[in-house]
Amino acid sequence: CCPTFGGSGVVATELGISLSKRGHEIHFVTYKQPVRLEYLSNNIRYHEVLVPEYPLFHYQPYELALSSKLVTVVKNHKIDVLHVHYAIPHAYAGFMAQQMLAEDGISLPMMTTLHGTDITLVGSHSFYKPAVNFSINRSDVVTSVSESLKKDTLNIFDIKKDIKVVPNFIDIANLSQSFEDCQR
């Protein structure tokens, strides 16, 4: 996920925390600890993606570093499923990780959750559109955070996969009394 306050970072982090409370082991793999991930525990781990500076590259290849880190984490922790949030670069790097793992006889299903600007802004740009289209179609499962985004995705890209809508969520148990006071 993107480790920021944006939708992909928040949804991915909250989903991971919820799954960890149900006993699942969760691994976040990104360039910075997600802002909503306040604590790590035995079943919540963060793996930093480091991108070494190399003067040959004008732009450092984050996708290569991410896909390599995913392979390492999968092998070291026996990951069952890869759930990537935000089509580019995460679904693309996830696909590359799947291919590298397949070389070692490891099959890993990948789920891609689409969040919005990865489709309507960044993804639809002519430079990225072929890679986004490819990555979505190579995902084993594709979800969208809204029906509207699903429709946009199907209109912008040539998607062969079924896209399931799983709406963003708000855990009302986390809302404080001060929120209710503001409503008066």
Kindly give the residue locations of the regions a language model identified.
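N-terminal subdomain of nucleotide-sugar transferases
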Residues: C1-V35, L40-H47, V141
